Amino acid sequence: MEEGNNNEEVIHLNNFHCHRGQEWINLRDGPITISDSSDEERIPMLVTPAPQQHEEEDLDDDVILTEDDSEDDYGEFLDLGPPGISEFTKPSGQTEREPKPGPSHNQAANDIVNPRSEQKVIILEEGSLLYTESDPLETQNQSSEDSETELLSNLGESAALADDQAIEEDCWLDHPYFQSLNQQPREITNQVVPQERQPEAELGRLLFQHEFPGPAFPRPEPQQGGISGPSSPQPAHPLGEFEDQQLASDDEEPGPAFPMQESQEPNLENIWGQEAAEVDQELVELLVKETEARFPDVANGFIEEIIHFKNYYDLNVLCNFLLENPDYPKREDRIIINPSSSLLASQDETKLPKIDFFDYSKLTPLDQRCFIQAADLLMADFKVLSSQDIKWALHELKGHYAITRKALSDAIKKWQELSPETSGKRKKRKQMNQYSYIDFKFEQGDIKIEKRMFFLENKRRHCRSYDRRALLPAVQQEQEFYEQKIKEMAEHEDFLLALQMNEEQYQKDGQLIECRCCYGEFPFEELTQCADAHLFCKECLIRYAQEAVFGSGKLELSCMEGSCTCSFPTSELEKVLPQTILYKYYERKAEEEVAAAYADELVRCPSCSFPALLDSDVKRFSCPNPHCRKETCRKCQGLWKEHNGLTCEELAEKDDIKYRTSIEEKMTAARIRKCHKCGTGLIKSEGCNRMSCRCGAQMCYLCRVSINGYDHFCQHPRSPGAPCQECSRCSLWTDPTEDDEKLIEEIQKEAEEEQKRKNGENTFKRIGPPLEKPVEKVQRVEALPRPVPQNLPQPQMPPYAFAHPPFPLPPVRPVFNNFPLNMGPIPAPYVPPLPNVRVNYDFGPIHMPLEHNLPMHFGPQPRHRF
């Protein structure tokens, strides 16, 4: 405020509604000075505290506004607009100027005392005066009527402009949770609170204290001696120049300047607007994010308003509030879907798919520009390899930077492992001559690339470098992918090294812990525990969970300790189990829970096995899977469009193949036992007749009834397979194959007879496989004793009858003066097959008369030459 300005106005805001925070307690009664002498300055405000007013200067119930008569020098009123609006809309003919902040003892007071824009009524309590510093108080009554008229006009116009801006902020104020908060009694002292919004026809109305009833919650009396009570604290900066003009309170218990029977919605909005500037926005955003992750159907903005209005700055408190009030506002614009659903993928994943640049099968060739940049980067990374070899490898790998760099790095790493350790430049150069090449190998699936690459004599000194911003998007993405993967690999190697060192330290100190399952010794970091703190190694838990989930299909993984009845917590399973086993476990668990809760309403699609809930009286099943969408019959599982008003039996009879298939399915179902609790099919391969389902139910395999334990079976001793002579209970150890075969045979005969009756004897076709007669049991024969050879007379066998002409005699070599003749090899004589004589026995030598014409040798070799 300028020094020469004496036309100042002081407004005593006796009842200004504010937040009960500690900062506002120190500032809400601060002085506020209003100057109307200059339009270029922002008007500071001084609030005179009520306990410091003098009783001798008590005035009437009138509001006095002191100003000059000239309209051109009309001062601005209080900045009653919203935080984003600096001044009110002036009447026509008045120039709009940008206000400038003036000096003030406390800048925070100017920022805090800003009623909201939607206020249409200003209530000034009796005793709250607007006066100037230089003029006496008696002159204030002269201009009260004129000031009231202009004040009402300005307030009405400003409230009309800001009415639309406040509608969006009040979206949740009508909710019943906020109504209960608004109606709670609160202690109100020295506050000017905006009244509830009135209709547009009543804009600009000024109400006084005498028009309202008394307070519903009076303020406690101030203490004697000038010490303010807890409801009226001293201002942060005392008033020095106004000490002689302080006004005393007209009543020890002044009432509020507004009625309490209606809602205080503008009140609460003002509180929120002031508190939002003080609250850590990062904490609020984190609370909103975590709460929406747990309650994805909550409406937008509702959680943030709950935080501000109810001061719930704890995640557990917010979750408990939503659980206790399930009728909170919910979203209607979209369907909430599990982000890990295998049916529908999120839009982000669809727009930006995550590509594994190390997978050769998923890569596509890049253009020439990307190839050139990738080659330049690789030549800068591998300066000991020739540019031809680098470009060849890059071309073979479709021009991708990441996979080429990984292949070259692996080849050099393998060369470093195979090369001997050297120290010194001379030895290194000598070894480089001996190991001056690397074997580049890339194998992935059916792709196999090999080449021997030789090192350069000297490293490449000149190579082109690129700024990261100058790279093409494809090359930059691959470079970032490679760096991230290398970082993850290095972290994994460090982690494995840390585990190894940790285990060595445990072993050195003798602190290894024994596993309760395999009795191996492990460090504590490699162990997991059940809810009762029984320790097991991770390998045992993985094998146990794999067998339980994929084998027996257990719903709960209980402790492997024999005497423990606890199970493994979900947090331990998530840390230890692989993703495949964990997902299957969750799938089994969800399936069992849904089947237990809706056993009669759970239906699976016959095409894709997608489960869904369907009312028992609905016959048509529409698969909700977006990749299937087939409509089938719930009973016969046939396509619904093929029914056309036909029953399931008529539809099956209409198509002979389907009819035969349905009969064969009945025959197959005769061998399958279904659980009475969950409906799972069971087939016994071996063991006793007490069957246990994965859901925990027990049944008899013979009579197919629900049982509990072994009391259902016969307990009398008897021979295996023999019926009991004392009771008619089921046997524990029997083979139910015969009973199943009889039932299948009955179903097959009934279907064949029905087919003969409808189609006739000539068109009869066998249904199902032919019945196999059971193999007759052959009595076990004891081993026969070995016969002892005896000299018994042997029967004479008839001679073997030959049906061929006599054998040709071998040619005789003529001898003329003993000169050898070149006649070639002499063919061997024909040898007939031996007679069918049993000679493989253990008796003594038998002299049998054989054919005397048979030769006793096979003759010379066929290619024998003399």
UniProtKB/Swiss-Prot annotation:
Please identify the protein, giving its name as recorded.
E3 ubiquitin-protein ligase RNF216
Amino acid composition bias (Acidic residues), ranges on this chain: 55-76
List the pathway annotation. Protein modification; protein ubiquitination
Question: Do you know which PANTHER family this protein is assigned to?
Answer: E3 UBIQUITIN-PROTEIN LIGASE RNF216, UBIQUITIN CONJUGATING ENZYME 7 INTERACTING PROTEIN-RELATED
Q: Quote the subunit structure annotation.
A: Interacts with UBE2L3 and to some extent with UBE2L6. Interacts with TRAF3, TLR3, TLR4, TLR5 and TLR9. Isoform 3/ZIN binds RIPK1.
Q: What is the effect of changing S719A?
A: Mild reduced activity
Annotated residues for binding of Zn(2+) 5: C700, C703, H716, C724
User: Residues involved in crosslink (Glycyl lysine isopeptide (Lys-Gly) (interchain with G-Cter in SUMO2))?
Assistant: K100, K351, K354, K425, K430, K448, K459, K485, K619, K658, K666, K765, K773
Q: Where are the zinc fingers (RING-type)?
A: 515-564, 675-703
Which residues are responsible for catalysis? C688
Q: Which CDD domains match?
A: BRcat_RBR_RNF216 (cd20339), Rcat_RBR_RNF216 (cd20353), RING-HC_RBR_RNF216 (cd16630)
